[in-house]
Design a protein with these regions (language model features):
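Hydrophobic/aromatic-rich, well-ordered segments within soluble, folded domains that form packed cores
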Residues: 1-13
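Intrinsically disordered, low-complexity segments enriched in small/polar residues
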Residues: 7-8, 16-115
Length: 115
């Protein structure tokens, strides 16, 4: 079972057509944010934003996957039940209208390399 814990319907495309629409349900998990203005660039505030603990995320349940924002998924890399829209589909103006897959978030390439 997949639950959508974002504000927007998640539209899944398959073979160029809408395959499934997963409507939002339940509270939307968010990371606590802290912003500190550290200056201005051309009159635009320049801030340092830190993301903290995740709020409003249900406990993990066997067989249940949760679609969440990439920030939430990144904050909890050990939660293998968290998914994000992947392989995005865009309209002619470049707006995101759906995705072709759901993905777990993982990091690579952040290690220190010796050339």
């Amino acid at each position: 079972m997949v639950k959508n814990l974002t504000h927007h319907p998640v539209v899944i495309y398959k073979n160029g057509s809408v395959f499934l629409i997963i409507e939002p349900e339940g509270p939307v998990p968010r990371c606590k944010e802290e912003r500190v203005q550290i200056g201005e660039i051309d009159g635009i505030p320049f801030t340092n934003t830190r993301f903290g603990i995740v709020q409003d995320l249900p406990e993990k349940k066997e067989g249940v996957f949760l679609i969440v924002s990439p920030i939430v998924a990144n904050a909890l890399p050990k939660r293998d039940d968290l998914l994000v829209p992947d392989d995005l589909v865009r309209d002619d103006q470049g707006n995101i209208i759906g995705c072709r897959a759901l993905a777990r978030v993982s990091w690579w390439g952040c290690e220190k390399f010796s050339w």
